[in-house]
Amino acid sequence: MGCNQILDRYIKQLVETSTPQAPAWNIEKLRAGKENTWNYIDGCMIKALIELYEITGEQRYLTFADDYIDFFVQEDGTIKHYDPQEYNLDNVNAGKTLYKLYDLVGKPKYRAAMDTIYRQLETQPRTKEGVFWHKAVYPNQIWLDGMYMAQP
């Protein structure tokens, strides 16, 4: 079996066994009895599926990514389980999916959600040097992955 077949089988199983409420790639929360929320890990996976769609043209990747993000994003651009006042860069990461999805499927609510996340960044606490704090609960801390998460 070639690499492409292995990847296809793996991704197919991952997608077929995942929902926004219970993603197969992020089961730690579920095992702990917690509800899945808008989060960093899901943002990484959905971004990867969008990139797979762009590489392969396989509509199922885009459809899954769109359905997944659509579950969280409300018509007015608010996002379920996302509180901008937490000032948590981890929650900004999933917002990267909105750029491509808006370009690819054109849902106005995705554009509105981008604005919601942008408003957080406008007021995100910063160090005296102007760098974003990683989270409000970690005053003056800068984390390396924050560079990845807070840049589109």
Give, region by region, the residue ranges found by the protein language model.
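A short, mixed-charge helix-start or loop-turn motif at secondary-structure junctions
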Residues: 28-34, 76-81, 133-137
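Phosphate/oxyanion-binding loops and surfaces in catalytic or ligand/nucleic-acid-binding neighborhoods
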Residues: 17, 104, 124
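Structured catalytic/translocation cores of nucleotide/phosphate-coupled proteins
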Residues: 76-77, 95-101, 117-121, 125-126
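Low-complexity, Ser/Thr/Pro/Gly-enriched N-terminal "stalk/linker" regions
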Residues: 1-73, 108-116, 129
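Proline-rich intrinsically disordered, low-complexity coils
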Residues: 20-23, 84, 108, 125, ...
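Well-ordered alpha-helical segments within folded domains of soluble proteins
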Residues: 37-54, 86-103, 142-152
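Mid-chain, structured segments of secreted extracytoplasmic proteins
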Residues: 61-99
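Asp-box/WD-like beta-propeller blade repeats and closely related beta-sheet repeat scaffolds
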Residues: 110-148
